[in-house]
Amino acid sequence: MDFIFTLFYFRFLRESSFRNLLYWSKLQRTPRFYAWAGISFEILAMNHISQVKQRLGIAGVSTNLYSWRSKSSGEADERAAQIDMVIERGDNTINLCEMKFSEGEFAINKDYDKILRNKIARFMEETKTRKSIQLTFISSYGLQRNMYSGIAQNEVVLDDLF
């Protein structure tokens, strides 16, 4: 957790004089803030892997935890892909974890559904895995139910981490 505060300090506090009383109010809606919040949320989730496993019902299953990035980029439909967290399980299942910080329920739309399907396809193709793949969505407040939300077989929310 110290790293999250250190990241926050160097991003927002170190060069601030705090003379502007609205500094924090204005900062909260900037791309810079959301980038920090996203990275911090990913670190938080990774630091709470025991709670993630508990929520997934795999607390007693041996696992390897890592991030993954595809080796190459192909055509538009086969772009390079990156998986935030991979949980490779001893029961021949792999959870591909997509992590998203949001201020409410996260909505998967048609374009994002295509990105997620590409990530799964690239992972399976490049790793040549024969294990069962489950997309797991880790987010602040869960997924908004819509025609695309069914792509995620599992869901973990911020409250599950504590």
Language-model regions: role of each:
Residues 1-83:
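Accessory nucleic acid-recognition modules appended to NTPase machines
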Residues 8, 94, 144:
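Flexible, glycine-rich phosphate/dinucleotide-binding loops
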Residues 12, 98, 108, 147-150:
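Short conserved micro-motifs at the rims of enzyme active sites and ligand-binding pockets
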Residues 49, 81-103, 116, 135:
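Conserved catalytic cores of phosphodiester-cleaving nucleases, focusing on short active-site segments
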Residues 54, 58-59, 122-130:
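Short mixed-charge
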Residues 102-122:
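Mg2+/Mn2+-dependent nuclease catalytic core
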Residues 129-162:
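Domain-level recognition of nuclease-like catalytic cores that cleave nucleotide substrates
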